[in-house]
């Protein structure tokens, strides 16, 4: 059998994969035998030989693991309004190419694992918690908390850190914010890496909260739905949850926040991840996640029209962009990535056939690392 050798550096070790050369386009290789070999310090070892399933055909090429855990070299708090102060941190290479990580939700906050998508020997990695989320204060606050406030915050943080321009990386709601920011400040963006596209249109909200996703997760859906009495469901569960998440009774807020968060966490992986689902039991996390997310959805993302992000693609058409989308994403179904791709064919679309929504699913995290590696080559 003829073999194609593909190797990709990941200091101090690199992964080498041998694939059957049954097609001259690596993205269209057919299933077959493969061997995975790791080289380190001049020594090589074949880890395993297995059979590639058909659903792997578009995701196995260039697969990479996440980078090793790292700690920030600096962090701080930036007051962005009379109400809000943002937590920020930097890790990686202080004089490297800047990249800003935009977390999901909105309200999800950042985590140490978010640093691991980027080569710390090349990138200056900037993470921050958006208004009301994570370590930013005040916690779960909805006042002065809109998409355009966040867009302005990103600019304030960039200026505070004296960064001329940066790569923008965002998934789920982070992709929404990345598009809004880059369309507002295209001259500050060197590239975009987007995951789990969410354009915050009515049909996307209706799919997830008004019964579409329930066809796939009817058991989890009933638990989410049944928190709301039948006589209060009306035409919108989002509105019914809004009432509870903003109740004067904190216990009512917590109960609604746990149910809202659990529904999303149950559906975020192709196979539900217990650790992820248990986040819903953390009242501090779930309150910010649910209240802020619901606040944005009730207000239609604070966009002037349902198709605002698609309508403004021309402003960023020239920016090098990779879109990574799980084929079986229930939270942000592929219709949104597909609509964006049709409006913006210049952007590369990578479909991960064995994944749902989460950036932590192996196929998605692999493609995200590859996308960041490709950006390195462009940025020198």
Swiss-Prot record:
Catalytically driven reaction(s): Release of N-terminal proline from a peptide
Top enzyme class: hydrolase
Record carries keyword RNA-binding: no
Keyword Hydrolase: yes
One Gene Ontology term, aspect cellular component: cytosol
GO BP of this protein: proteolysis; response to metal ion; response to salt; response to water deprivation
Domain AB hydrolase-1: 98-360
Active site residues according to the UniProt entry: 172, 329, 357
The EC number(s) this enzyme carries: 3.4.11.5
Keywords: Aminopeptidase, Cytoplasm, Hydrolase, Protease
GO MF annotations, alphabetized: aminopeptidase activity
Pfam families assigned: Abhydrolase_1
Highest taxon listed in the record's lineage: Eukaryota
Cleaved signal peptide residues: none
Subcellular locations according to the entry: Cytoplasm
Family, per entry: Belongs to the peptidase S33 family.
Biological role: Specifically catalyzes the removal of N-terminal proline residues from peptides.
Name of the molecule in the record: Proline iminopeptidase
Source organism: Arabidopsis thaliana (Mouse-ear cress)
Lineage start: Eukaryota, Viridiplantae, Streptophyta, Embryophyta, Tracheophyta
């Amino acid at each position: 059998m003829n073999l194609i050798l593909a190797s990709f550096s990941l200091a101090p070790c690199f992964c080498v994969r041998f694939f059957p050369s049954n097609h001259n386009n690596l993205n269209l290789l057919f299933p077959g035998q493969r061997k995975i070999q790791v080289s380190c310090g001049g020594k090589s070892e074949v880890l395993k030989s297995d059979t590639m399933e058909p659903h792997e055909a578009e995701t196995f090429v260039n697969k990479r693991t996440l980078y090793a855990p790292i700690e920030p070299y600096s962090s701080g708090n930036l007051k962005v309004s009379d109400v809000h102060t943002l937590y920020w941190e930097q890790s990686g290479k202080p004089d490297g190419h800047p990249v800003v990580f935009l977390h999901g939700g909105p309200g999800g906050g950042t985590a140490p694992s978010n640093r691991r998508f980027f080569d710390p020997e090349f990138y200056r990695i900037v993470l921050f918690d958006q208004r009301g989320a994570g370590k930013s204060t005040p916690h779960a606050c909805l006042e002065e908390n809109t998409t355009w406030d966040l867009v302005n915050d990103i600019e304030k943080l960039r200026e505070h850190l004296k960064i001329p321009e940066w790569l923008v990386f965002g998934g789920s709601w982070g992709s929404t914010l990345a598009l809004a920011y880059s369309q507002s400040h295209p001259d500050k963006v060197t590239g975009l890496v987007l995951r789990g596209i969410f354009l915050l249109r009515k049909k996307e909200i209706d799919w997830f909260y008004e019964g579409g996703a329930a066809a796939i997760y009817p058991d989890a859906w009933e638990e989410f739905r049944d928190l709301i009495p039948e006589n209060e469901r009306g035409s919108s569960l989002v509105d019914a949850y809004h009432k509870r998440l903003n109740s004067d009774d904190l216990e009512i807020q917590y109960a609604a926040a746990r149910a809202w968060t659990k529904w999303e966490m149950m559906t975020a992986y192709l196979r539900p991840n217990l650790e992820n689902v248990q986040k819903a039991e953390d009242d501090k996390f779930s309150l910010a996640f649910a209240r802020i997310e619901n606040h944005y959805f009730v207000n239609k993302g604070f966009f002037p029209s349902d198709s605002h992000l698609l309508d403004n693609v021309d402003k960023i058409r020239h920016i090098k962009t990779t879109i990574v989308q799980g084929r079986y994403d229930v939270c942000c179904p592929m219709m949104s990535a597909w609509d964006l791709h049709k409006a913006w064919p210049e952007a590369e679309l990578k479909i991960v056939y064995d994944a749902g929504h989460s950036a932590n699913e192996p196929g998605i995290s692999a493609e995200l690392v590859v996308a960041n590696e490709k950006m390195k080559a462009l940025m020198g």
